């Protein structure tokens, strides 16, 4: 395993606590230029940075940090939105931030080149699909720093991987889903079958299996086969109709807890749950209640990935000339991933289940429970 650095996200991810686009954009400041959900995510990221005791160093040089987003768009209410919020949270008089959105896979390399040509000090690729183009650019432009969300290092001094052990937090989500289901059936689906997606699904199904083992139950998990490493996928991160079709099919199979791992497509699943009243949803990447409050009534929890804080940190490191190619790995132990609060569902989840989740989290963090 490659050496990884650790960045604590403070206490951003508690378990079981209730709490009452154009293609190019530079430093939007509210109003018509930024969705409310993204502003709220930015506030959450800023709060996490405050926990870390982060302050911006004085600098005469202006640092330009740029994000190359995938086709999900900046307002996907998931990892793109989280990445942009993280960048915004460290923007100030000495740091400017901007992003480019890809309309298709063919835009990845040209968008990265455009950002380099514009003088970006660091280019952050958001999403596994852009990893190859970013690694190639790192070799071609050694004077520019690069970082990739959901990808590993490229073996060059100017390229950093930002990775997350989301199978750990998804294991907790699977255990929670198995304890909550009334029908004995839960489900998950993904956008596309690659590690940044399947890690969530694999952890979720294994969490269900763990619940069955310790409770001597037989909850069924649809959508992912941990042996075959394959399951139910939309095929992209933009087909709302297909995501809706999958969600309805799961309900027909009696699934009453659904975990979509497909970025903004989770909205189709949540909207269906609100309409059908047959299921609840586990959101992915960001806190769904904050990112997509219109779905609050059907979101039992969210599996969090500390994209925003890791993006903010790598920008700060570039600004202070402390950039390192050592990959970052967010885990339960360093709070780089975790579960969101239960919000409206807090009273519906037993104290025993909450305590079990805490014990499981500690065991995973300590290494005594292997996933």
Where are these regions (language model features)?
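C-terminal segment of classical bacterial N-terminal signal peptides
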Residues: 50-58
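Bacterial N-terminal signal peptides that target proteins for export
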Residues: 33-44
